[in-house]
Curated annotation (Swiss-Prot):
UniProt EC number: 1.6.5.-, 1.7.1.17
GO molecular function: electron transfer activity; FMN binding; oxidoreductase activity, acting on NAD(P)H as acceptor; oxidoreductase activity, acting on NAD(P)H, quinone or similar compound as acceptor
Similarity comment: family membership: Belongs to the azoreductase type 1 family.
Keywords: Flavoprotein, FMN, NAD, Oxidoreductase
Gene name in the database record: azoR2
Catalytic activity entry: 2 a quinone + NADH + H(+) = 2 a 1,4-benzosemiquinone + NAD(+); N,N-dimethyl-1,4-phenylenediamine + anthranilate + 2 NAD(+) = 2-(4-dimethylaminophenyl)diazenylbenzoate + 2 NADH + 2 H(+)
Superkingdom of source: Bacteria
Official protein name in the record: FMN-dependent NADH:quinone oxidoreductase 2
Disulfide bonds: none
Family matches, as SUPFAM superfamilies: Flavoproteins
């Protein structure tokens, strides 16, 4: 079993709720599955281009670097993706990465009816953190991070999607990063156990 652990946050771990929760999830996963291979991808240190005329011209080329990156992504069985919510969605580094690896006829295909059919198996966990409290309407209508990641998981055909999102990490719930980790331990452990 191969797991890709993706982060998209430039903060240091002890200053980041999402990164700290992600590390907790990865620690639990490794304890439960010591023989599984886990690889890390830090999108704040790796450069993935935003879509432009050059990248789009290679989008359908099965021999392009994009296709190679897409096939590498597909070779994993499980994905743990960790990111904060910025401006109502995922950071642009994560969006750019997904835009460059989610390629038609590698991770999904269009059916004759025009719908997407995923070509991946596998599972995904998304761990996020939001500065404000977006857990209830009307704010929940504007939180697109978790919705976006779930949509991506469904589009590429993943069999399972789970998420844990900490709300109000910068707002009225004045907790330290360590307190957030303590607060989330049980939920993260349960999520990873079924992953």
């Amino acid at each position: 079993m191969r797991v890709l652990y993706i982060t998209a946050n430039p903060k240091l771990i002890h200053h980041s709720v999402s990164l700290s929760l992600g590390e907790l999830a990865l620690q639990y996963y490794r304890e439960l599955n010591p023989s599984h291979i886990t690889d890390r991808l830090d999108l704040t240190t790796e450069e993935y281009p935003h879509l432009n005329s050059d990248t789009l011209s290679n989008f359908m080329n099965p021999h392009s670097n994009l296709a190679t990156q897409s096939k590498i992504f597909k070779d994993y069985d499980k994905y743990i993706i960790v990111a904060p919510m910025w401006n109502l969605t995922v950071p642009s580094a994560l969006k750019a990465y997904l835009d460059t690896v989610i390629i038609p006829n590698v991770l999904f295909r269009y059916t004759e009816q025009g719908t997407c059919e995923g070509l991946c198996g596998g599972k995904m966990i998304y761990i996020g953190a939001r500065g404000g409290d977006y857990s209830h309407p009307p704010q929940s209508e504007y939180a697109f991070d978790d919705k976006y990641m779930e949509g991506i998981a469904k589009m590429i055909g993943l069999e399972s999607y789970q998420s844990y999102v900490a709300n109000a990490v910068g707002g009225y719930r004045r907790r330290s990063v360590a307190q957030w980790v303590e607060h989330a331990k049980y939920d993260i452990e349960q999520m990873v156990t079924s992953f």
